[in-house]
Amino acid sequence: VFLRSGGTSAGFSLDWRHSDERTERELTTELRGEIVTLTPVTEAHVPDLRRIRGTAEVGARWGSIDDSPTWPFDDPTTTCFTVLEGGVVRGFVQYGEEEDPMYRHASVDLFLDPAAHGRGLGTDTVRTMARHLLHDRGHHRLVIDPAVDNDAAIRCYKAVGFREVGVMRGYERDTDGEGWHDGLLMDLLAEDLT
C-alpha cells in the first residue's frame, strides 16, 4: 500500500488559529490508533524515514530522496508525524491546513514501509490522523490526492470514509520529470469518518 498523501487521538483538544505558528503542545502531540502511534518527527526518526522513502516502491510515488536533502524538515507549512508500530518506524504522515475560514480544510499525505504492507497500518494511520484533524484541529473536511493508478491507497482511503470527487488530469509531475500523471481528488467530511 503506497499511501500518499481504530483508536482515538490524544485525549485533549487543541485550539486552531489562523496562523502558521505551532505551539509546543501541537509539536509534541502523540496520536494513538489501534495499531499505530503517530509521533512528531524527530532527528532520531530521519534515517529510517529516509531509508523507507528511498525504497523503489515509495520512491516511485514520492520521488527521489536525493532531491530533498533537508526532508522531512523542508516544508514549514506541513506538520509531520512518524508512524510507529510497537516503537518501530513504519512510515510517515503529514498534513497541511487551509486556514482561510471560507475554505478551511486539511490535506493529508503519507507513505508506509513496503515491508509493513497488508497489516492494516495504512487504514489505522489514516483514521487516526483524520480523527485528530476533525476532532482536535476543528476541520470539517479533509482531502487526499493519490495517483489514479494507486489502487491500494484508494482502497485504504475509502475504508476510512473518503469519497472520490474527481480526476485531476495531468495533476502531478512524474517522478522521472518526463511527464505528468492524473491524480484522484478524494475528500472526507466529518460525518463520513468510519
Task: Give the ranges of each region predicted by the language model.
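A short, well-structured alpha-helix characteristic of acyl/acetyltransferase catalytic modules
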Residues: L14-W71, L189-T194
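Glycine-rich phosphate/pyrophosphate-binding loop shared by adenosine-nucleotide-utilizing enzymes
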Residues: V36, V88-F92, H181
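Acetyl-CoA-dependent GNAT
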Residues: G59-H117, T123, H132, L189-L193
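Short hydrophobic/aromatic beta-strand or adjacent loop that forms the aromatic wall/cage
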Residues: T78, H181-L185
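Conserved active-site alpha-helix within GNAT-family acetyltransferase domains
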Residues: T123, V148-G166
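Conserved acyl-CoA
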Residues: D124-R141
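Conserved catalytic-core motifs of GNAT/GCN5-like acyltransferases
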Residues: V143-P146, R163-H181
